[in-house]
Every structure is written in C-alpha cells, then in structure tokens.
C-alpha cells in the first residue's frame, strides 16, 4: 500500500512539474444564507451564464452553504442565479471575472411559499480580489485600448504594474521572468536578452483579452520562474459577429527634439506602418465559436549611416569616414574581376524590418461541465543588422569600430535576424460534481532564430570590411 502511495505521489509531482504557469481561467465562489437567521442554505443551485457567448456553469452549495466554480471563462458580463425550492430566486448581473483571480459573490435568500417571481439585483458593487495569491495587476482589454503605447508590445502595457520595467520586475533580471499566452510559455530560450521572442512581441495587442502581471505569486500553478511574470489570454468568439480593421503609423515627426532646454537636433528619418484585422463570432450559437487575427508591420531601417570620403578626410559629425571612395572601388573591382564576388554597395544599405503575426482560436462548449479552447499563433520577425562594429587588435591593444570614421563596410556584410515563433495550446476545463474540477492543458512552442546574410551574398564568404591605415 505504501509503495503504491509513493508511486502515485511521484506521478503527481511529475505532472505538476509539466504544468508550469498555467493560468488561463477565473473562478467564482461565495456563500448562500437565509436573510433572517443567517443560516447556511444546503443544496441551493447556482447557475452562472457568460452572457456574450451563452456559456453556462453550475454548482450546488455544500454543507456549509458555500459554492465554488473553477475553470470559468475570463471576462463577462456574467449573470448568476441561485435557486432553492420554497425560496425566492436571487440574481446578480454585470459580474466581470479577471484572469487568475476568484470573484466572491454571496447571496441571501428569503422564504416565499408562493414563489411568485424572482428578485433581480443589477450593478452590485464588486467584491473582487477576496482571493488574491500575491501582488498582481490585472489589465483589461478596455484599459489596453485606451492606454497610449509606443511599440504596441506586452511589456509596454505591463508598465501599469508599479513593479514592472519591461520584462524586469521589482529590479530583477528580465531573463528570470516568465511570459505565458493561454498557458504556453513564450520566453527567450536563447537567453541573450530579456526581450520576448518574435521581435519582442509574439502576439498582437488586438488579439489579447486580458493581461495579468504577478510578482512572487504563491499560487502553485505559477512556478519555475523567479520574481515576476506576465500571463495573457487571447480573445474568444461570442454569439455576435464582431470585427475590426486598423492601420497605425508613426514617424520621426511624432518624436520630440528637445529635453528641457537641450536641443537634440534633427532626427533621422524613420517610420513604422502596421496593418491588421480581427474577426470572431459563432459557428454554432451558444456552442462553438471562433476568433482570428492577422497583423503585418514594416519599418525602414537605417543599418549604416556612414559614407566613404571623397578626399580621405573624416567628418564624424556628418557620418563621413576617412576611408576614400577610390579605395572602396579598388577593393570592389578586384573582388569582382578575380573572384567573381560582388560585395555589394558601399553607398546604399537597403533594409526594411517587417513583422507578421497570425492567430486563430476555437472555443467549444462541449457540455455545461466541459469547455475546450484551442489556439494557434505564428509570428515571423525580420530585423536587419550591420556587421559587428567592434574590433580589437590583440598585439597593439588598439580598439576601434569597423563602422566609424575609421572604417567602412559593403552592404554584403549586412545580415538579418529571422525570428519565428509557432505556438499551440489546447485547454480543457472540466467539473465533476460540486467539489471537483480539473484543467487539462497541452501546449507546444517552437522558436527558431536564424541569421541570414544579405541578398547580395549567397556563398560562404566572410563579411568584408575596408578600414583605412592608421
């Protein structure tokens, strides 16, 4: 018997290790009592309805008059009704559930031998946050849409938490923090920076329903990270077809040039254009729903501002290198004539960063006790970079930059960082009776970070840099 118990404990711990940071739902709890005696009502029926989608949840009060419904859909509004034979029905509407939190809603019931009707209470004050599990900040979709944001990123939104600074929380290293999307971990597995994969933003802001920022939570579902984390859930379809189309644009004219009395001078030309749409609705009313989002953004990138000099004299203020045009031409012609290798232009460094995001989600109310959500998203980001600018001579201890007033490069030395992220999650929330609930969550994430050379370089040649003599 002890051996079986030990094996069961090991299996349970193993399952818990796989289930890391799985916060995708909300919960509802409360107590039902009589209004005149404050006596607990045993066996009262609780029914909660997510009004936009018609999703229904049910529970029965226990011997202490308490009820709990786990695995509920985040958001609302919800309408909650309590009924018991011989008593007036009680109803509360307008309840909003927040991610990872438990909403507390109590009811008092009065006897009614005739049971003529029901009493409706609307707009009741929220009793939310009675079941906090650590310092947390919940950010609704309405707040996200009204919040000014520069780069439309998760970390930009997370600053509503007083602990957050990018992916750093309470002064901790951002690489020790955690980010989940519908329960899937989407962290920078390479660990070189604290930025999220997919160019720092693996999902469109218009596809997110709610964000929760947590710091040192003691919820056992949120583990395997130090300090803080961001949990986000995506939008779902409802019984109403809804869609949006949007375009965002910004350039250097939307940036200031002065700080106090200091003039920073003219800003270089830059701009970002973003196109996208969302669309969702019912496949089968009250039963099956879909939601889709696509977004594409492009931004011209200035990889190298430096130009070769006409007379061999450097002008750092105007980004003129002391490497003469004649030397650049000699090297280029030599490579073409003798090796049939074109290193590219030294006057033009064309580069355009772009980012594509796709997301699709299906929600299925299998029964009132079983609800399934399946989500897939894909992000591809392309960002251009110049050749590594640092250079060090071990013998002379001379340090300089390859792209500076001392050196120049050809466009063929550029390379792009091609980041792609594919993620899928399947989340089944089930309730078995009044006291048992279960979440079965399957997630898979594939992150690929490639380095690709410029279009003008397709062989194994090393990036070529021309540096003038000292």
Where do the PLM segments sit?
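Periplasm-facing N-terminal accessory domains of Gram-negative outer-membrane beta-barrel systems
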Residues: 20-122, 126
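Residue-level signature of outer-membrane beta-barrel architecture
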Residues: 215, 234, 281-283, 364-366, ...
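Transmembrane beta-barrel strands of outer-membrane/channel proteins
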Residues: 123, 245-251, 292-296, 374-378, ...
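Extracellular loop and loop/strand-boundary signature of outer-membrane beta-barrel proteins
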Residues: 196-197, 261-265, 344-348, 409-414, ...
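Outer-membrane beta-barrel translocator/receptor signature
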Residues: 193, 206-212, 220-229, 235-328, ...
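Outer-envelope beta-barrel architecture signal
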Residues: 154, 175-177, 237-241, 286-290, ...
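Periplasmic N-terminal accessory/gating domains of Gram-negative outer-membrane beta-barrel systems
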Residues: 62, 88, 93-106, 117-236, ...
């Amino acid at each position: 018997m002890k051996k079986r118990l030990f094996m069961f404990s090991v299996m349970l711990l193993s399952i818990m290790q796989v289930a890391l940071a799985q916060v995708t739902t909300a919960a509802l709890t409360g107590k039902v009592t009589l209004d005149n005696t404050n006596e607990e009502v045993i066996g009262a029926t609780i029914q909660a309805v997510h009004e936009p989608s018609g999703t229904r949840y049910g529970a029965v009060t226990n011997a202490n008059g308490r009820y709990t419904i786990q695995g509920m859909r985040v958001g609302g509004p919800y309408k909650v009704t309590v009924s018991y034979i011989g008593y007036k029905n009680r109803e509360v509407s307008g309840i909003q559930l927040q991610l990872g939190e438990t909403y507390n809603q109590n009811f008092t019931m009065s006897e009614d031998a005739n049971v003529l009707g029901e009493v409706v209470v609307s707009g009741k004050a929220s009793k939310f946050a009675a079941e906090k599990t650590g310092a947390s900040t919940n950010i609704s979709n309405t707040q996200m849409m009204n919040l000014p944001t520069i780069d439309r990123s998760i970390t930009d939104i997370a600053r509503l938490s007083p602990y957050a600074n990018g992916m750093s929380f309470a002064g901790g290293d951002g690489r020790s923090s955690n980010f989940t999307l519908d329960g899937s971990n989407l962290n920078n597995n390479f660990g070189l920076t604290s930025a999220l994969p997919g160019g720092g933003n693996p999902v469109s802001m218009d596809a997110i329903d709610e964000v929760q920022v947590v710091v040192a939570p003691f919820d056992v579902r949120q583990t395997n990270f130090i300090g803080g984390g961001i949990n986000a859930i995506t939008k779902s379809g409802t019984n109403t077809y809804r869609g949006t189309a949007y375009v965002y644009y910004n350039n250097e004219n939307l940036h200031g040039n002065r700080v106090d009395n200091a003039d920073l001078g003219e800003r270089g030309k830059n701009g970002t254009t973003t196109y996208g749409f969302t669309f969702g609705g019912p496949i089968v009313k009250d039963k099956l729903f879909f939601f889709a989002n696509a977004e594409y953004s492009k931004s011209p990138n200035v990889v190298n501002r430096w130009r070769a000099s006409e007379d061999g004299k450097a002008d750092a203020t105007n980004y003129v290198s002391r490497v003469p045009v004649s030397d650049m031409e000699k090297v280029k012609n030599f490579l073409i004539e003798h090796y049939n290798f074109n290193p590219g232009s030294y006057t033009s460094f064309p580069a355009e960063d772009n980012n594509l995001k796709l997301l699709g989600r299906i929600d299925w109310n299998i029964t009132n006790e079983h609800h399934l959500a399946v989500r897939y998203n894909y992000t591809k980001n392309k960002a251009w970079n110049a050749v590594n600018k640092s250079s060090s001579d071990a013998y002379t201890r001379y340090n300089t930059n390859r792209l500076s007033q001392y050196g120049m490069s050809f466009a063929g030395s550029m390379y792009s960082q091609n980041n792609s992220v594919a993620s899928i999650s399947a989340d089944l929330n089930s309730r078995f009776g009044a006291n048992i609930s279960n979440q079965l969550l399957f997630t898979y994430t594939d992150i690929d970070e490639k380095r690709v050379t410029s279009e003008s370089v397709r062989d194994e040649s090393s990036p070529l840099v021309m540096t003038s003599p000292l």
